């Protein structure tokens, strides 16, 4: 999730119904391009698996996971309970928990799968690495798996920056802005390295490129990616109003980008990239 401790509800981006719809759409996009929800080779036919979803938001990932597993125990955590669902799958519980804080002692070594998606960007790289290591410690030694999905704001190749110049401008502006919030603009490029440095076994990675708008051969998926990104640009404009003085970045800097990027998406396209990395705890 997108965390900023001094915001009213704990999130940098807005937390209204529109943002909830965007997060659901983003979940569906990533799942489509992953090919399936869980890439870690769990024993799916084994009953009573224990699964954690860190940064669960409204629990949609857990809801999908509940249809794949046999009588699992599902645990969702987030920095804010605002989006926790009133209607929950059986054997599902939700807890308020920041990735920067110690986890409950009794959770250590207890999960068959620890999952997290698009969360680690909300802290600086060194803190992000330690946050992932604390999550790994929650997996069962020898048999427990972790699966992390992250993106980066510097994923365009030099050729793609020429092809999608407005998207490149947006990424450069946000990459300059995020360190002022103590965010990491490139976590997707670091996760595999961190997991291998920890000593995880059977580490694998899947890189997903999602064409935006006119660049997507599937019009429905292209439109979903376009709407998702337009709302992201708008949300970062709002976030820029919270920047301290002297950063050299203004919310108004996003206005021409928001105007031009819509045209670029509808005429040329764009690219989103996400990295999913999974491995087994030794």
From Swiss-Prot:
Choose any GO biological process term that the UniProt entry carries and state it.
mycotoxin biosynthetic process
Q: What is its EC number?
A: 2.1.1.-
Q: Which GO terms describe its molecular function?
A: methyltransferase activity
UniProt keyword terms in alphabetical order: Methyltransferase, S-adenosyl-L-methionine, Transferase, Virulence
Report the top EC class in one word.
transferase
Family from the record: Belongs to the methyltransferase superfamily. LaeA methyltransferase family.
Relate the protein's function as given in its record.
N-methyltransferase; part of the gene cluster that mediates the biosynthesis of gliotoxin, a member of the epipolythiodioxopiperazine (ETP) class of toxins characterized by a disulfide bridged cyclic dipeptide. The first step in gliotoxin biosynthesis is the condensation of serine and phenylalanine to form the cyclo-L-phenylalanyl-L-serine diketopiperazine (DKP) by the NRPS gliP. GliP is also able to produce the DKP cyclo-L-tryptophanyl-L-serine, suggesting that the substrate specificity of the first adenylation (A) domain in gliP is sufficiently relaxed to accommodate both L-Phe and L-Trp.
Can you say what this protein is called?
A: N-methyltransferase gliN
At the highest ranks, the source species' classification is: Eukaryota, Fungi, Dikarya, Ascomycota, Pezizomycotina
